[in-house]
Amino acid sequence: VKLSKSFANIPSLVDKLRAAGAKGVVLFNRSYQPDIDIDKVQMVAGDVFTSAGEISDTIRHAGIVSALVPGISIASSTGIHDGEAALKCLLAGAHVTQICTVLYKKGPQFVAEMIATIESWMQVKGYYSVSEFRGKLNAASVKSATMYERMQFMKYFANKDN
């Protein structure tokens, strides 16, 4: 089931989908993004492509859902533009990642570069299989799960070591 990030309680929704028989979820489906042309004073289509900066919500929810809803496969999507971003999603708990924008911008041959980045990182870290590190940094596995929780910006930085 492909989900939008506009739901209020994504872990609860994913758990209900799992209980109803869903085997997996995609976090996230990117919605149509409208824009306004202020010179022509009319609605126009916004950027159809994701940016690498959109990865944060994808990582956050993969980390939370993988910790709270065992037994469902998670595909991370949105903001994945390179091998490092794919690794972040896998470390957060995603089983797989999906890419689209980078294929349009760099072509299908870029997949080999992403795979090479992942394989190189795995070799340096001593991993032989993705299953060895999948979810290693999900909300249940990190010292401070507050990194995944919704919190005020200033509260986080007030407690951060400088």
Label for each model-derived stretch:
Residues 36-51, 104-127:
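C-terminal helical cap(s) of enzyme catalytic domains, especially alpha/beta-barrels
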Residues 79-80, 136:
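Gly/Ser/Thr-rich helix-start
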Residues 80-82, 103-104:
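Short Gly/Pro-enriched loop/turn and capping motifs at secondary-structure junctions
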